[in-house]
Swiss-Prot record:
This is DNA ligase. It comes from Christiangramia forsetii (strain DSM 17595 / CGMCC 1.15422 / KT0803). Belongs to the NAD-dependent DNA ligase family. LigA subfamily. It catalyses: NAD(+) + (deoxyribonucleotide)n-3'-hydroxyl + 5'-phospho-(deoxyribonucleotide)m = (deoxyribonucleotide)n+m + AMP + beta-nicotinamide D-nucleotide. The lineage of its organism: Bacteria, Pseudomonadati, Bacteroidota, Flavobacteriia, Flavobacteriales. NAD(+) binds at D31, Y32, E33, F34, D35, S80, L81, E110, R133, E169, K284, K308.
C-alpha cells in the first residue's frame, strides 16, 4: 500500500505542476525537477503494473486547453518528447532504435528553443489556421495573432504541397525582450519575468494589435501531413526554407551518436551566443520510413528525443529579504544571498517579484534556495531546499509599511505589486522621479547625475523637479565632490533645459504608462499642458493608440494637487509646456497615413531631422520594411537588405530630394 500511496502522490503532484505550467503559465519547479519526478513515476508504474491508470501524467502530453479561443482538434497529434540528460541515455536510446530498424541511421540535430509551440496549416500556399499545442490532441485557434508575426509567411513561395501542417516555436529574442522590459520599467510597470512566458502569453492576448507590437518570431522545424513530397526530416527543413519559413540555420545532419554528442557539447558551451533562449537539443531519426517503423509510445515518438541542458541553477543561503521602492512607489522584494557563481557572474541578490511569489514558493529567511538565471534581467529564486530548512523557521510576513517612509502599503485590486502611497514624502520616489526628469531622453540636464540628485534631496535642497529651477550655485557648492566649475555646469545645465520641447517635458513629468511615444502623441494632439490637464478619460481614449489604462493614469496624475502645483511652478520658471508657435506653423498633415523607413547617409538634412520632419507632418516612422511601409527614404550607403526587401514588396524608394519635395 505504501507504493500505491507514493504513485498516487506523484501523479497528483505532477498533475498540479502540469496545470501550473500549461494552464496558468506559472511553473513552480524547473523542467529538470519535473522530468526527474516524471521519470520516478514511470519507473514505479513499470515495476508495479497493477497500479496502471490511463489518466496518469505519464500517458498525457500536457495540461488543459485555455478556453479564451476556439478549441480546435489537431489533425496530426502534437506529441511531446522524451527527455535525456546524459551521454548514456542517448546511447541507450540509439540501442533501442537499432533493435527495431535495420540499416544506417542518420540523425538531425536541432536546437530546442524555449518558447510556445504552434502548428500552422497551409492550403494551396495560404496560411489557413494557427493552433497552439494545448494538450497535444487539441489547442486554441490563434490565427489572427499569429498573422501579426512577420516571420510567419502568409503566402508561400516556390512549389509546395497542396495541404500540410508545419510545427514550430514562437520565441521572443533576448534583444526584443530587453527592449520591452526597458519600456515597461520606463512607464513604471513591472518587467516581464522571462522570454518564454512572455511569448506564450502573447499568443493568448485578445488584441492582435498588441501582439503585433511585440517582437515575436516563429522558428519552424517539422513538416507533417500526407503527400508532402518530403522523404526525410532534413529535406523537410531545406524545403521549408525555400517556401519562405524561418528555419534555424543551426540544424545539422549527423551520421552517428558520437557526432550528435559533439553537436550537443558545442551548443551547451555556445548557447549564450544565440539571440534566443534555448534549453537543449532535439535529436530526430532523419528518414521518414524509419520514423514510421519506430512509431510512437502513448506519449512521445520513439524516433526523437530531447537532450536537456542542465539549468544554470545553484543553491545558496538566503540571508535576508529586503524591499526596494521604485519611482512610482512599487515595492519589490529582494533576496539577499550568500555570493554564488552563476552563468559567469557572481550573484548576491535575486528578485522575489511580489508577495504572491514569496507565498507560492514559501521562501523564508535562512532557507537554502535554488537560484536560476535564464533570460531574466536579474536572477530569480525558483525553489527552496526544504530538507535544509530550520524547523524553527517562520513563514515570511510581507512588509506592511514602506521601508523608507513607514507609510502603510496599499495593493489595488487585480495588481500583483504593493505600493507606497506617500508620493510626495517618500525619498526613493522623490529621487526616482527627479532622476527620470533629468534623464537623457527627458530634460537631459548636463552636469546633473543620479548621485547628485540624491545628494540634493538628502540635503533638503530639493523635494521635486520644480525645485531644481530655484537652486543657486552657492547652495550646491558645499555638496560632496562639487567644485566651482561643476557647480556652474549644473546651474547652466538646468537653465538650458528650459529650451527642451513640450513633448519631452511631458515625458519627463513621469506620468505612469506615458513613455516617449505616448508623450509625443499627447503633445501633438493637445498642443499645451492646459488642454491636456482639462481632458477627460473619454476624450483621451478617443486618441489613436491611447487605451483606458493610459487615460486613467493621465487624469489621475493631474488630479493630484502636488502635481498641478509642480506644473504651475514649471510654467513660472519658463519651461516649454506648449508646442511653440514656430513649431505649430511647421506642422502639417501632408504625410498622414504614410509610413516611412529611413536608411543611409544624407547630404542636406540629418537622419534625426528627417525623422522630425516626418512626424511633424503627420507621417509614421518604422525601423524595418514591411508590407505596411509606404516609402523607403534612401541615402548613401544604405543597408542592402532593406533595399532588397523594399524592391521585393514593391515599396516606393525615394531620395532625400524626393522626400523634401513631398513637403512643398
Amino acid at each position: 500500500m505504501e507504493v500505491e500511496k507514493k504513485i498516487r502522490g506523484l501523479r497528483e503532484e505532477l498533475q498540479q505542476h502540469n496545470y501550473n505550467y500549461y494552464v496558468l503559465d506559472k511553473p513552480q519547479i524547473s523542467d529538470y525537477e519535473f522530468d526527474i519526478k516524471l521519470k520516478e513515476l514511470q519507473e514505479l508504474e513499470e515495476k508495479y503494473p497493477e497500479f496502471e491508470d490511463d489518466n496518469s501524467p505519464t500517458r498525457r502530453v500536457g495540461g488543459a486547453v485555455t478556453k479564451n479561443f476556439e478549441t480546435v482538434v489537431h489533425e496530426n497529434r502534437m506529441y511531446s518528447l522524451s527527455n535525456s540528460y546524459s551521454k548514456e541515455e542517448l546511447e541507450e536510446w540509439e540501442a533501442r532504435l537499432k533493435k527495431i530498424v535495420e540499416g544506417k541511421i542518420q540523425y538531425v540535430c536541432e536546437l530546442k528553443y524555449d518558447g510556445a509551440s504552434i502548428s500552422l496549416t497551409y492550403e494551396n500556399g495560404i496560411l489557413k489556421r494557427a493552433v497552439t499545442r494545448g494538450d497535444g490532441f487539441q489547442g486554441d485557434d490563434v490565427t489572427n495573432n499569429i498573422k501579426t508575426i512577420r516571420s510567419v509567411p502568409l503566402k508561400l513561395k516556390d512549389e509546395f504541397p497542396h495541404k500540410f501542417d508545419i510545427r514550430g516555436e514562437i520565441v521572443l529574442p533576448y534583444e526584443g525582450f530587453a527592449k520591452m522590459n526597458a519600456e515597461r520599467v520606463e512607464m513604471g510597470e513591472e518587467p516581464y519575468a522571462n522570454p518564454r512566458n512572455t511569448a506564450s502569453g502573447s499568443l493568448k492576448l485578445q488584441d492582435s494589435a498588441e501582439v503585433a507590437r511585440r517582437p515575436l518570431e516563429c522558428l519552424l522545424y517539422s513538416i507533417t501531413g500526407e503527400n508532402t513530397g518530403v522523404a526525410s526530416q532534413f529535406e523537410g527543413l531545406e524545403k521549408a526554407r525555400k517556401w519562405g519559413f524561418k528555419v534555424p540555420a543551426e540544424s545539422e545532419l549527423k551520421d552517428s551518436i558520437e557526432e550528435v554528442l559533439h553537436y550537443i557539447n558545442y551548443w551547451d558551451e555556445h548557447r549564450h551566443d544565440l539571440p534566443y533562449e534555448t534549453d537543449g537539443v532535439v535529436v530526430k531519426v532523419n528518414n521518414f520510413h524509419q520514423q514510421e517503423e519506430l512509431g510512437h509510445t502513448a506519449k512521445s515518438p520513439r524516433w526523437a528525443i530531447a537532450y536537456k541542458f542542465k539549468a544554470e541553477q545553484e543553491s545558496t543561503k538566503l540571508n535576508k529579504i529586503t524591499y526596494q521602492v521604485g519611482r512610482t512607489g512599487a515595492i519589490t522584494p529582494v533576496a539577499n544571498l550568500d555570493a554564488v557563481q552563476l552563468a559567469g557572474t557572481v550573484v548576491r541578490r535575486a528578485s522575489l517579484h511580489n508577495a504572491d511569489q514569496i507565498e507560492k514558493l514559501d521562501v523564508r529567511e535562512g532557507d537554502t534556495v535554488f537560484v536560476e538565471k535564464g533570460g531574466e534581467i536579474i536572477p530569480k529564486i525558483v525553489g527552496v531546499d526544504f530538507t535544509k530548512r530550520d524547523p524553527d523557521s517562520n513563514p515570511t510576513q510581507y512588509a506592511t509599511n514602506c521601508p523608507e517612509c513607514d507609510s502603510e502599503l496599499i495593493r489595488k485590486d487585480g495588481e500583483a505589486q504593493h505600493y507606497c502611497p506617500n508620493v510626495n514624502g517618500c525619498p526613493p520616489q522623490i529621487i526616482g522621479r527627479i532622476q527620470h526628469y533629468i534623464s537623457r531622453k527627458a530634460m537631459d540636464i548636463e552636469g546633473l547625475g543620479g548621485e547628485t540628485v540624491a545628494l540634493l534631496v538628502n540635503a533638503d535642497l530639493i523635494e521635486s523637479y520644480a525645485d531644481l529651477y530655484k537652486l543657486q550655485k552657492e547652495e550646491v557648492l558645499p555638496l560632496e565632490r562639487m567644485a566651482e566649475k561643476s557647480a556652474e555646469n549644473l546651474i547652466n545645465g538646468i537653465e538650458r533645459s528650459k529650451e527642451i520641447p513640450f513633448e519631452r517635458v511631458l515625458f519627463a513629468l513621469g506620468i505612469r504608462y506615458v513613455g516617449e511615444t505616448v508623450a509625443k502623441k499627447l503633445a501633438k494632439h493637445f498642443k499645451s499642458i492646459e488642454a491636456l490637464m482639462a481632458a477627460s478619460e473619454e476624450e483621451l481614449v478617443n486618441i489613436d493608440e491611447i487605451g483606458e489604462r493610459i487615460a486613467w493614469s493621465v487624469v489621475e496624475f493631474f488630479n493630484i494637487e502636488a502635481n498641478r502645483e509642480n506644473v504651475e511652478r514649471l510654467k513660472e520658471y519658463g519651461i516649454q509646456l506648449e508646442i511653440s508657435a514656430e513649431k505649430l506653423a511647421n506642422q502639417t498633415n501632408i504625410l498622414e497615413g504614410n509610413t516611412f523607413v529611413i536608411s543611409g547617409v544624407f547630404e542636406k538634412v540629418s537622419r534625426n531631422d528627417l525623422k522630425k520632419m516626418i512626424e511633424d507632418n503627420g507621417g509614421k516612422l518604422s525601423s524595418s520594411i514591411s508590407s505596411k511601409t509606404n516609402y523607403l527614404v534612401a541615402g548613401d550607403n544604405m543597408g542592402p537588405s532593406k533595399l532588397a526587401k523594399a524592391e521585393k514588396l514593391g515599396t516606393s524608394i525615394i531620395s532625400e530630394e524626393d522626400f523634401l519635395k513631398m513637403l512643398e
